[in-house]
């Protein structure tokens, strides 16, 4: 039997302020609200579901257990310059990037959203990632 390949289509992010995060995801990334969550909202770009959850900075599980989770997320854009203008206008702050001519690398630019969450944008993608996919039937 062939090994199945599973597709990542959902990420849950702990945010300090759901309303601020939701507005940023709408304004910066053009995402839309897909529904409510128990402690937040579900956003979508038409392919991915991203839950923005108010967890008060607490990790799941044991209260004093170290939390290991999402360090940042990335978005594949058509026009990097336009995307940079859009995320900055929505309140993002630039803090780094990988030079476009670094060998064995892809170019990405890192930002923090208004709640402090780290994300990057790229027009060249990531190894193994596919930019456009066919959505599931409704």
Predicted regions and their residues:
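Vicinal oxygen chelate
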Residues: 1-4, 7-16, 44, 62-138, ...
């Amino acid at each position: 039997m062939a090994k199945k390949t599973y597709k990542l289509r959902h990420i849950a992010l702990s945010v300090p302020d759901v309303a601020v995060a939701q507005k940023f995801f709408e304004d910066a990334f053009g995402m839309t609200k897909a529904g409510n969550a128990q402690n937040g909202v579900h956003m979508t770009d038409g392919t991915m579901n991203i839950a923005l959850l108010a967890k008060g900075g607490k990790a799941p599980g044991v209260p004093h257990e170290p939390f290991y989770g999402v360090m940042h997320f990335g978005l594949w854009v058509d026009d990097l310059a336009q995307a940079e203008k859009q995320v900055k206008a929505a309140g993002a702050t630039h803090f780094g990037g990988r030079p476009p001519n670094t060998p064995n690398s892809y170019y990405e630019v890192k930002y923090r959203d208004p709640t402090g969450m780290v994300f990057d944008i790229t027009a060249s993608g990531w190894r193994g990632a596919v930019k456009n996919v066919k959505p599931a039937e409704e």
